Amino acid sequence: MDDSDDEYSRSHGETLTFVDPEDDGVSIGNTQDSQFAYEQFSVPTQSSQATDLLPGGTDGTTNDLPFHDVEDDESDSEKSLTEEQHEQKLPEHACRYCGISDPLCVAKCTVCRKWFCNSNDGTSGGHIVHHMVRSQHKEAYTHKDSPCGDTQLECYRCGSKNVFNLGFIPGKKDQVVVIICRTPCASIAFQNDDNWSPEDWKSVIAEKQLLSWIVNVPSEEQVARARKITATQAVRMEELWRDHPEATVDDLNKPGLDREPDHVQLRYVDAHHYSKVFRPLVAIEAEYDRRVKESASQAVGTVRWEQGLRQSVLAFFHLPQFADGVMKLAKGDELRLKHSQTVDGSEWTKIGSVFKIPDNHGDEVGIEIRGAVDKSVMESRIMFTVDVVWNATTFERQYKALAALLNDSKAISPYLYQKLLGHPAEEMMLKFDLPRRLSVAGLPELNSSQMQAVKQVLTRPLSLIQGPPGTGKTVVSATIVYHLVQKTEGNVLVCSPSNIAVDHLAEKIHKTGLKVVRLCARSREHSETTVPYLTLQHQLKVMGGAELQKLIQLKDEAGELEFKDDLRYMQLKRVKEHELLAAADVICCTCSSAADARLSKIRTRTVLIDESTQATEPEILVSIMRGVRQLVLVGDHCQLGPVVICKKAAIAGLSQSLFERLVLLGIRPFRLQVQYRMHPVLSEFPSNVFYDGSLQNGVTENDRHMTGVDWHWPKPNKPAFFWHCSGSEELSASGTSFLNRTEAANVEKLVSKLIKAGVQPHQIGVITSYEGQRSFIVNYMHTQGTLNSKLYENVEIASVDAFQGREKDYIIVTCVRSNDILGIGFLSDPRRLNVAITRAKYGLVLVGNAKVLARHDLWHELINHYKSKEMLYEGPINALKPLNLALPKATIRTKNNIAGNANRFGIKRMQYTFNEYKSNDPSQPRLPPTYSNSQNLLSMSKLAQTFNKNVPIPAHMMDPNVYAAARNQKDRRRGDQRRPPPQAEAAMDLSQGMMSQQSQQYPPQGASSQSQYLLDGASSLSGWSQSQTTTTTTRHHHHRQNRNSQQQMSQDMDDIQQKMDDLLFSQDC
């Protein structure tokens, strides 16, 4: 298990649990994990064959691999055994994966009573640990003949049996160790006994195996004689055991056991084909979500009761599984509270909506129960149990949207229908008289790239806007909506997959003076929101009329109405809701809520979807199956993508957003290019690596100098540094996440020092990719922090996902991963790194093990950047000293690629810019310029024209009869070695927008054709910008191979220069 063990809810920042992405098998899904190769991220695998299905699996393995028994060599006369005979011969305590039965090497899962060995052959950890992670069984029992004897592993103080939370410390007597849980017992012991320190505690699990003095690791000879099992098979066994506990490995080979769904495609024949692909994926995701939610039942003990508003009752309780990261909740989710301690033994049950989840202010979960609760229940000490109520509404709406696409010809315009399916459609422009002034009162003035995006979007039926961090995409979206309202009949619908993003955009649009209604799902009408004054519920109370207002007040006071009054209330409410929605200029809601029945009669022809790269295609479909004629998608495919919890669905392509697919089809996004968030020092690395050096700084160093704060950075005028620390990682109590106690202690030191320096706690954010680390830091600050625990409550400690789209003045990133062999998991995803290091305005601190992280090429580049800028340090916080570290050679390639300046660390690119063609060194990074004087439109236009020459060369300007050949990756060289620029692009079917590698063929030796150029191909989405047309794969090669082709192409460069100048001139006009 790796970081895919940690995933997070995009709406409220709570986490979703994922398991072991470094295993090769299909497991709980994580769409932003290192298991996805960079081709799947930047140009998904289907792009290599635009009309073919995606290849199955992530690692080339099949799902029906048979097991092979190893013959027993002890007796020459013994014949090989069949699988069935082998199973019959094995003793009860044999490993259920591989069959190893040495009592010294096995342990029993106390929950399911199955035995497993401590070998990691075929899996990323010991078989017993792998089983406990996958099944979420957390208790183990050693064999009577094992080193520890017949023993239940448990804490000697509290009796906790959670193996993932157990460790040991030296006993006060020689040759004795004490098994004790990490929290709370070890923490208490360290505080009360000076003879013990936190460094003395060691986990009983190291490198995902039980320590050998507890359960021996099988020898190489034992492993060689055992049944061979792959990670895929182990995962499938765990899934099979959920419904069939007595299943054996033979059952894996039964036909039809695990049919893989069809993969998404770049293009679809028709709506029937589209629906046939996506309906099974939605069904798989829905079933998996249901299973996960309904299996999350646990005892919560006693409940604390309070009287709420509107005659509701509030129930507060502790959820141990939430603290462990097993149960995932978001505000608005429904929980079922129940007990069986009634007089007649019947079950008492109530359903409530979650309004509070554990945070820095407290570790209780709070639910609001509508209606009365018997006093006898509230006053008795009853032991309650909690279940999660699964809500199928979201998936049902996706089914209906797919059906509408199939059956309703009026559900979407013919043009958008063709674009959705990937068919060629004649480009069209909408009739729209552009206003003389594009900037809107109440919003900041637009810069040049923002103006260009607004102009283009208003006149097109389909537009994509890419908004890198801090570039003001919310301002641009609000401006677009304002102008659309002035020219469009009916409402403009604004959607996002995230409630937080909807609230933020609704607030920004409201500042323009438009009438905005924030439509919430009925289950969330009483949930917290940052724009309560815009909600439909609030506007009903204010503008609903005297009779309706009276009934609303009566309902709030009494909790419910009499039958006659309730009918009248519902009638008046429906009429008034329709009036308010019909009269609104803009309706804001989530993508799912766009299918709310209250919108069924509202005419909407224009839809803008914010954060569209975080939504799956069926989610987007829900928003647009309303007869939509104009669609604007806003997002950034270089940041986090959709959350898909079922890995099988994610691998099949459900995790690819519509935004990404449209880019692959040749629709050019308009990229915003001026960032207003980060100090220029902080923006340099993400600009060069993730955005091809295109980000300009709209703020200066002086703008990002914090006054009134007594904080001194190790390197003056450089508000960032990497703090190297070598503490070891540990599995968290959930078994599906990680924590690093050394880094947590250093984070507390940094936070405390910032607060002492005058920084307000709410200005500080701590980012981690691991729920285990987040939970540990929160607890550590409250129990062992040097300042008053109240001061830490307003320090936000959250996941990367929770911080996307947001910012803080100071950001601390704790990397957590520190091991010798297991890799860095989540951290290998460049999109996560991009989000994490682009949240800070004034200062950024990275805390991690530089030696371990530098083995990965992208982190090697980041750490080398910090080292070159003299921002790499080690030592105590008050005595930091430069780290003189010889960085190890990066041995792990980036799998998820969004590299812009790709040649710097060997990542392919889809295209090169015209300036790179003209220059002789495309590998030279372009530093982000400072974008000054935003009020001078003439200088803005001139600068934009100059800067926009850094765009990919349109394919039609190149010779269409070009051959391309891939160069061996081993021939790549890092450093400052100069390479010739590419001289041509691969052949391409422009009418279809095909990016087929079939057109890239090796030319015959000695061919004299002028189109005989060897080019270096690539696949990255990050280089697409507002000046881009349909691009194809380009390839450049070694000097000696290219010398002749350079001479052949030189005569065409002047013509290309003139065509590019004409293109840029026409765009600027």
UniProtKB/Swiss-Prot annotation:
Gene3D superfamilies: 2.40.30.230, 6.10.140.1240, P-loop containing nucleotide triphosphate hydrolases. Residues 51-65, 991-1013 have a biased composition (Low complexity). Residues 77-86 have a biased composition (Basic and acidic residues). Residues 87-244 form the Upf1 CH-rich domain. Residues 95-127 are annotated as: C3H. One of its GO terms (molecular function) is double-stranded DNA helicase activity. One of its GO terms (cellular component) is nucleus. The keyword Secreted does not apply. Its EC number is 3.6.4.12, 3.6.4.13. Zn(2+) 2 binds at C109, C112, H131, H137. Residues 155-185 are annotated as: C4. Zn(2+) 3 binds at C155, C158, C181, C185. Residues 1-86, 966-1069 are annotated as: Disordered. It is found in: Cytoplasm. Residues 109-137 are annotated as: CC/SHH/C. It catalyses: ATP + H2O = ADP + phosphate + H(+). It is an enzyme of class 3 (hydrolase). It comes from the Eukaryota. It holds the Pfam family UPF1_1B_dom. Zn(2+) 1 binds at C95, C98, C117, H127. ATP binds at Q450, G467, P468, P469, G470, T471, G472, K473, T474, Q639, Y676, E807. Phosphorylated probably by smg-1. Smg-3 and smg-4 are required for phosphorylation. PANTHER family: DNA2/NAM7 HELICASE FAMILY, REGULATOR OF NONSENSE TRANSCRIPTS 1. RNA-dependent helicase required for nonsense-mediated decay (NMD) of aberrant mRNAs containing premature stop codons and modulates the expression level of normal mRNAs. Is recruited to mRNAs upon translation termination and undergoes a cycle of phosphorylation and dephosphorylation; its phosphorylation appears to be a key step in NMD. The formation of an smg-2-3-4 surveillance complex is believed to activate NMD. This is Regulator of nonsense transcripts 1.
